[in-house]
């Protein structure tokens, strides 16, 4: 086994504990107000939120440029830690929407028109997608103290900011309260406005932060789980197609449902990767030589090398070329996703839809059996990874799972301008916040 992978397995190895409460299902041990979470023995994680860019509507040349920049971002991931890219689909909170968008009444004789305008906005919000898509990068590392972890994350923050800026996206650190809000909104869907957490007050009273975010109940069955009044299921990508189009992630997350899709990335140092591929290539060449020797012993001197051995040799050489001449890196990847629904029937229908999308792309998704709790903690943006269904990928093949789709314009106290053609979400713009005030969108 590759040294990097065996080290990560050793570090991730923890004593198995059966959770005795809902709080114990959440794999966070300690939180700090700046957003760093301790998620295991000497394991720290930090989440960054990044904005979407107009990838789906870009020209072919622009798409290639964005794709190459995204490859550079993947190459910049540190070998000493693991990275998780998460796409979070959540329903628009009606209370927050009304607070941010609707015009408040002034009692000046014009409230009739304000009411009509507000009703129009509410109608549009109901007919539109009404889903908000948020994107996160969670970086986790093994450090002895929180000070060492802070130094490491400060360096990672600088690198991520520069790479996302080149892509035309903005990257920002998620603080402790905002990260707990993300988890609360997933665990307690429909109760988003009820979240309130003050870390200082919680410390003073000796309360656990988990009490503020956890659902009422957790019931894990063979192939689904119950979370309060909602049902959920975790899927993972079992088999990958030889060629995957770059719109696969966009199609999977286009569902009008609450879901989280995560891609765990473990980069391997190039020298280790080259040694591993050389070993594999040497093994293939040895098999071919032994096969030819057997044929010669049978006086068959014109035998053609079998197709499978020839294919193994060709693929090993291609992989070696990618690593040595095309500046790509070897990475291990896992794609997991969790989706929730209000009923078991709706959950089964949604699962079938997702499996169909996978089959359409010649990929096979599977439901995790008896691993729903581990799968849930892997798909959530904690930074933990409990599923080991790794796939060896190069930077180029991993970059196909590009998380970008289209940029939504949603300014607080903005004016309704129409509907986004791709995402079907409302365009709410405040011209004072735009780069150019003429409002060309």
Located regions from the model:
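Active-site-adjacent "gating/activation" loops or surface patches in catalytic cores
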Residues: 404-441
């Amino acid at each position: 086994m590759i040294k990097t992978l065996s080290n990560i397995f050793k570090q991730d190895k923890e004593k198995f504990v059966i959770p005795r409460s809902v709080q114990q299902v959440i794999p966070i041990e300690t939180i700090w107000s700046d957003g760093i979470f301790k998620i295991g023995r000497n394991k720290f994680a930090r989440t960054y939120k990044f904005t979407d860019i107009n990838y789906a509507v870009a020209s072919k040349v622009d798409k290639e440029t964005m794709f190459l920049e995204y490859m550079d971002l993947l190459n910049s991931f540190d070998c000493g830690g693991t990275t998780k890219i998460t796409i979070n689909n959540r329903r628009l909170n009606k209370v927050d929407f009304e607070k941010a968008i609707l015009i408040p009444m002034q009692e000046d004789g014009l409230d009739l028109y304000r009411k009509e305008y507000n009703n129009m906005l509410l109608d549009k919000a109901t007919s539109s997608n009404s889903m908000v898509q948020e994107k996160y990068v969670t970086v986790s590392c093994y450090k002895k103290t929180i000070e060492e972890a802070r130094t490491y994350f400060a360096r990672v923050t600088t690198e991520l900011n520069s790479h996302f800026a080149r892509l035309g996206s903005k990257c920002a650190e998620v603080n402790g309260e905002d990260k707990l809000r993300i988890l609360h909104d997933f665990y307690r869907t429909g109760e988003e406005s009820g979240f309130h957490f003050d870390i200082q007050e919680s410390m003073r009273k000796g309360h656990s932060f988990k009490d503020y975010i956890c659902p009422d109940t957790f019931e894990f069955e063979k192939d689904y789980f119950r979370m309060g009044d909602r049902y959920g299921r975790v899927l993972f990508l079992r088999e990958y197609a030889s060629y995957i189009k770059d719109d696969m992630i966009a199609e999977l997350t286009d569902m009008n449902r609450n879901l989280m899709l995560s891609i765990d990335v473990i980069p391997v140092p190039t020298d280790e990767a080259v040694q591993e591929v050389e070993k594999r290539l040497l093994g293939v060449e040895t098999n071919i030589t032994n096969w030819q020797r057997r044929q010669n012993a049978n006086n068959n001197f014109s035998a053609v090398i079998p197709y499978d051995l020839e294919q193994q040799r060709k693929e090993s050489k291609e992989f070696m070329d990618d690593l040595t001449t095309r500046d790509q890196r070897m990475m291990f990847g896992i794609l997991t996703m969790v989706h929730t629904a209000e009923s078991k029937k709706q959950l089964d229908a949604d699962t079938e839809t997702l499996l169909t999308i996978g089959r359409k792309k010649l990929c096979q998704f599977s439901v995790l059996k008896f691993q729903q709790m581990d799968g849930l903690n892997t798909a959530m943006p904690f930074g933990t990874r409990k599923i080991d269904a790794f796939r060896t990928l190069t930077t180029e093949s991993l970059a196909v799972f590009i998380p970008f789709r289209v940029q939504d314009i949603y300014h607080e106290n903005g004016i309704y301008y129409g509907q986004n053609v791709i995402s079907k979400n409302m365009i709410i713009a405040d011209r004072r916040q735009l780069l150019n005030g003429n409002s060309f969108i």
